[in-house]
Structures are given as structure tokens and as C-alpha cells.
UniProtKB/Swiss-Prot annotation:
E.C. no: 6.3.2.2
Keywords recorded for this protein, A-Z: ATP-binding, Ligase, Nucleotide-binding
UniProt-listed Pfam families: GCS2
Originating organism: Pseudomonas entomophila (strain L48)
UniProt keyword ATP-binding, yes or no: yes
Reaction(s) catalysed by this chain's protein: L-cysteine + L-glutamate + ATP = gamma-L-glutamyl-L-cysteine + ADP + phosphate + H(+)
Descriptive protein name: Putative glutamate--cysteine ligase 2
PANTHER family noted in UniProt: GLUTAMATE--CYSTEINE LIGASE 2-RELATED (PTHR36510:SF1)
SUPFAM superfamilies documented for this protein: Glutamine synthetase/guanido kinase
């Protein structure tokens, strides 16, 4: 990903039974083989046998991303359907038993589970990650500092983990609560520039706190493999269009933040505000009240998005479509909203608690296919 402003998307999925909605703790070798065959180089293993990751190629446009990811979703979904298996893309599963999941046995993941024990075992969650390429010579820590304040808004737009272990957690993104159990997985440390980042990394490596090839899992980070800044705060998005809107907004934000220096550089105050907004985003999602950076006044999620658009004018058709879809998400709801609504409806229709949770899981899997959630005239 060498060209600036190109981007890539990583999506994590759980493999689940399409009839029961239950996560498959030990998918058959044939299912795993089919995933590899269908995805090729875009297939990646994840922490659990029941989890996979789809790593996109490098894209130049949202149209290109929509075409590739949409076709991938359709083909893989249909192929796995032959086995009675579906792809569960929300950030948490409503009734999966994490203690029954089998960790993947490769050396990398064995080390991860050995180091982090129960924290790793509990992390049966899916995220959406977006890489954006930046020009050579860019100080990526300075760039991260300029976009830091807006990160919780991306979490608001993606929330999809309200249900966990058979319960309503009260959070819109319980995944971020689980992420908080890990070291180096919240907001990035207050590092002024790339030199400070290198000193911090070197300190942890010298003292044995970070392996030589170790990584930070911050909500946003400079990638070690690519010349990119990687957004990691987002919950997994079952609907393709929601993930594309987030990718489009993030790409637009990074591109414009690099060109301007007026007002969003990180101060202690901005970090305080961002940390508070981060918690509110996880707890309340789109119904939360947040703190504006400029006037430090309460602002709704819709008002917050409008502030982003005023700071970041939609100067392309792609940017305008991304803002339009983001407004639709805030108006109609995220996956977290739809899961709670589906659970309430299932209970009203007489399903017991466990069966109602499985109905939620089946609905999430149905949203995997392209076009879910779009008005008919907008399905490409």
C-alpha cells in the first residue's frame, strides 16, 4: 500500500450455524478449506478456530471496494451456505459461550493466549479495521494526533455489540469494554511525534514489556507492515454499506487532516474530551451526548457528525455519499439498535430468551449479503 490515499479494509467474522445461530467452536476442515479456496490471498486466520478475517487488497475508490467486497461476501456466503454455515459479522455474538471456543494453535496465537490468558480467551469479538496510505515522509504520530478527537464518532457509527453471554450488557459496544482488558488497546499514548513513538517503543522492548516484533493494538495506530494509519476502534459492521461509509469518512479525514493544522492538534484538554467521548460512544452509541472540541458544549451524535462535515467539507462524490450514509446510520440505527429490536420482537412473538437470542444471530447473518439496509434504488 505505497500510494497515498489508497486504502484497505479488514473484516472479522465468526462462523455460525445458519439454523441455530450458534457459533461453531470447531468448524469442519471442509468449511475452513472452502473459506481458503474462495478467499485466496484475502483469507487470514484469527484467534479462534471459529473466527476468520478477510483482508482486502488495496483500493483506489469506494466503488472499487464496494464491488470487490460485495462480490466476496456474496460468493463466500453462498458457498458456506452449502454447509449450513453463515458469516456472523457483528462485534459480539448474543449467546456464544467464549469458554467453549478453541484457540487457534499456530505459534503466534499460542503465544498470545499464553501471555494474556483469560483476557485472550474472553476476546471472542469482531472488529472492522481500515488502513489509509499516506505520503512518504509523513509523521504518522502527528497525523494520528490531529484526527484523535474524531475517533469515538467512528465507534458510534459502528456499534454492534450490545449482547454478550446471553445478556444485554447495557452498552452499545461491549467489545470496547473487552478491549479495555488488554494492554495497549485503548487510545494511543500521548506521543508528540514519530521520534517520541520510537523512544516509547524502544523503552518497552528494552525492558521486556514488548517483543521485538510486538505491536500496539491502539484504537488507531501507525501500521508496522505498511505506510498507513490504521483505524481499529470500530465494531464489526454486518452491513457492507455501513463499513464502506466508515472507510470513506476515515479516508477523507486522514487526507484533509494532513493538509491542515488548525484546531485539532492534541492538547491535554482534547485528550480528556476524547477519552470521555470514547466511553460515552461505547455506552450510549448514537443516543449519547458528547463534548464538542471547540466550544466544549454538549452535542448530539448528529450534531457531532455535522461538526465533522463543517471541518471536513465533502468535496467529492465519494465523501458526500459517505456522509449521507453516516447520517442514515444515525437516523435509522446501527447493528446494536437492530439487535435489540430483533430480540424484543422475538420475545413478543413468544420465543424464550435463548431462542430469541438465536433469532438475533440469524438476523445478523442475513445482513452479511450486499444490499442489506439500502433502499432498493440504491442497490448496485
Amino acid at each position: 500500500m505505497a500510494r497515498p490515499w489508497t486504502f484497505g479494509i479488514e473484516e472479522e467474522y465468526l462462523l455460525a450455524d445458519t439454523t441455530s445461530g450458534q457459533v461453531l467452536a470447531s468448524p469442519s476442515p471442509a468449511v475452513t478449506r472452502r473459506c481458503r479456496e474462495m478467499l485466496g490471498a484475502t483469507f487470514a486466520e484469527e484467534m479462534f478456530l471459529s473466527q476468520i478475517e478477510v483482508v482486502s487488497p488495496v483500493f483506489d475508490s469506494l466503488h472499487q471496494a464496494r464491488s470487490f467486497l460485495g462480490e466476496n461476501r456474496q460468493r463466500l456466503g453462498e458457498a458456506l451456505g452449502d454447509f449450513g454455515v453463515g458469516l456472523y459479522g457483528a462485534a459480539s455474538h448474543p449467546c456464544a459461550q467464549w469458554l467453549r471456543q478453541h484457540p487457534r494453535g499456530t505459534a503466534h496465537f499460542r503465544q498470545l493466549f499464553d501471555d494474556y490468558r483469560l483476557v485472550a480467551r474472553r476476546s471472542l469479538v469482531n472488529g472492522l479495521h481500515v488502513h489509509v496510505g499516506v505520503p512518504a515522509g509523513t509523521d504518522r504520530m502527528q497525523l494520528i494526533n490531529r484526527v484523535l478527537y474524531w475517533l469515538p464518532l467512528f465507534l458510534v457509527l459502528s456499534t454492534s455489540s450490545p449482547l454478550w453471554g446471553g445478556q444485554d450488557t447495557g452498552y452499545m459496544s461491549y467489545r470496547r469494554v473487552i478491549c479495555g482488558e488488554w494492554p495497549h488497546m485503548g487510545l494511543p499514548e500521548p506521543l508528540a511525534d514519530w521520534h517520541a513513538y520510537q523512544r516509547y517503543r524502544g523503552l518497552l522492548q528494552r525492558t521486556g514489556a514488548l517483543a521485538e516484533d510486538g505491536d500496539f493494538w491502539w484504537a488507531i495506530r501507525p501500521s508496522r507492515r505498511f505506510p498507513t494509519v490504521e483505524l481499529r476502534i470500530c465494531d464489526g459492521c454486518p452491513r457492507l454499506e455501513d463499513g464502506l461509509a466508515i472507510a470513506g469518512l476515515y479516508r477523507h479525514l486522514v487526507q484533509h487532516a494532513l493538509a491542515r493544522h488548525d484546531g485539532m492538534a492534541v492538547s491535554r484538554e482534547i485528550r480528556w474530551i476524547t477519552q470521555e467521548n470514547y466511553w460515552r460512544a461505547a455506552r450510549y452509541g448514537r443516543r449519547g451526548t458528547f463534548i464538542g472540541a471547540v466550544d466544549q458544549q454538549p452535542v448530539s451524535a448528529e450534531g457531532w457528525l455535522a461538526q465533522l462535515q463543517s471541518w471536513l467539507p465533502a468535496d467529492s462524490a465519494e465523501a458526500e455519499r459517505s456522509f449521507m450514509q453516516a447520517r442514515r446510520i444515525l437516523r435509522e440505527g446501527t447493528s446494536a439498535d437492530r439487535q435489540r429490536e430483533a430480540y424484543a420482537l422475538a420475545r413478543e412473538n413468544g420465543l424464550a430468551g435463548r431462542e430469541a437470542l438465536r433469532a438475533v444471530a440469524r438476523q445478523v447473518m442475513a445482513e452479511h449479503f450486499p444490499g442489506a439496509g439500502l433502499p432498493q434504488g440504491e442497490i448496485e
